[in-house]
Amino acid sequence: MVKFETVRGMKDYIGIDAEKIRYLESTFRDLAKKYGYSEIITPVVEEFKLFELKGGEELRQTMYVFKDKADREISLRPEITPSVARAYIQNLQSSPKPIRLFYFGTVYRYDEPQYGRYREFRQAGIEMIGDSSILADVEVLDLLYNFYDKLNLSKDITIKINNIGIFRKIMDKYNIEDNLQEHVLHLIDKNKVDEALVILEKNIKNKDIMDFLNMILTKKEAKLEDIESLAELEEVSKLDIKNEFEYLLRLSRILSSLNVKFKVDLGFVRGLAYYTGLIFEVLHPSVQFSIAGGGRYDKLIELYGGLPSPAIGFAIGVERTLLVIKDLKVEEPINVIVVGISEEAIPAMFTVSRMLRKEEYKVVINTKDQPLSKLLPYYASQGFKLAIIIGKQELEKNMITVRNLITRKQISIPLENVLDAIKQTL
């Protein structure tokens, strides 16, 4: 007999596990709306070229790509930012700026499955398009921090930040071509710094600059005074990157004033190839990987054929975030089981069920053909708090019996008074 299972790297979420995902989704959605963001829903399937154009070395190698019936090369989205950029050009380019958008959806990557890494997973994220100010950057980071604060994780997480513009400006100055730049950044992202330095040395051929690069790549936690000192170095002036360091100083001071827990890691880069300035990731001490990340991508929309538009955003790994939450208690409505003793009780069963559901109770109608002596203990073991019993005597008097399955307290009252009876038995 054929046996079907989930595809490798994918997972079913049932009951409370599904509820936790929906809880994170609703928490994020409510918060994003309070910041003035509007929801965008984009297709799971996009043209492969959308991601190939500026997807980054790693991303291009780990995608689901196939030909459709029209022989077009199609892919399952490995992330959502390019789809939002495409949708912005297609639908929103003439709208007043900045555009604030948020999303929640599944993405797909053909990675080797392991702890915290899946082939299908969920991302919640935002994009702000049309604003290049530091205020926009702070808003995005503040929203991200407040999301984790709502999950009671703000004391545990650290937001790691850097300015990838430092590396891009240095490589641009020495005319290092784009593809090689992405390869170098990919190596640094994968902690292959020595390999990256070998490539840079072949192209830069300047010992002072290489010493400077070696120094900043090992600055894993730069203090304000470190950044101030670096900004005054002769190499920084020669490379025309003083503004990039001063930006980090300004941002650090603002985040400190907002009590956001962060660190500046000058050796930190992100693997996605479209970042141009600020980059950041959310770290939690219980896992070795980031649980969220993002950055500024000021050239992506122009690359896709749109008008030049600065942009910044982030994506939260939903499943990864759930891994670091120790005790997520999703509020459940009170569970009520409605038991009818005969077929004649069916109209009354549905009448009372409708009344309770309007009041946000979770109501299940019993379909088991078993005696009450077995049904009530069974439903108590399944987490039901109340049972509404409609038997022959109740039908004759237009009454119902409400029983607390925990305390065993019960009362019989007219059907229309069911809400009062529930309050009395709880």
UniProtKB/Swiss-Prot annotation:
GO terms, molecular function: ATP binding; histidine-tRNA ligase activity
Reactions listed under catalytic activity: tRNA(His) + L-histidine + ATP = L-histidyl-tRNA(His) + AMP + diphosphate + H(+)
Matching InterPro entries: aa-tRNA-synth_II, aa-tRNA-synth_II/BPL/LPL, Anticodon-bd, Anticodon-bd_dom_sf, His-tRNA-ligase, HisRS-like_core, HisRS/HisZ, HisZ
Principal location class: cytoplasm
UniProt keyword terms in alphabetical order: Aminoacyl-tRNA synthetase, ATP-binding, Cytoplasm, Ligase, Nucleotide-binding, Protein biosynthesis
GO BP annotations listed: histidyl-tRNA aminoacylation; L-histidine biosynthetic process
Keyword flag Cytoplasm: yes
Gene Ontology CC entries for this record: cytoplasm
EC annotation from Swiss-Prot or TrEMBL: 6.1.1.21
Family affiliation: Belongs to the class-II aminoacyl-tRNA synthetase family.
PANTHER family xref list: HISTIDINE--TRNA LIGASE, MITOCHONDRIAL-RELATED (PTHR43707:SF1), HISTIDYL-TRNA SYNTHETASE (PTHR43707)
Protein name per the record: Histidine--tRNA ligase
Species this chain originates from: Saccharolobus solfataricus (strain ATCC 35092 / DSM 1617 / JCM 11322 / P2) (Sulfolobus solfataricus)
Gene designation: hisS
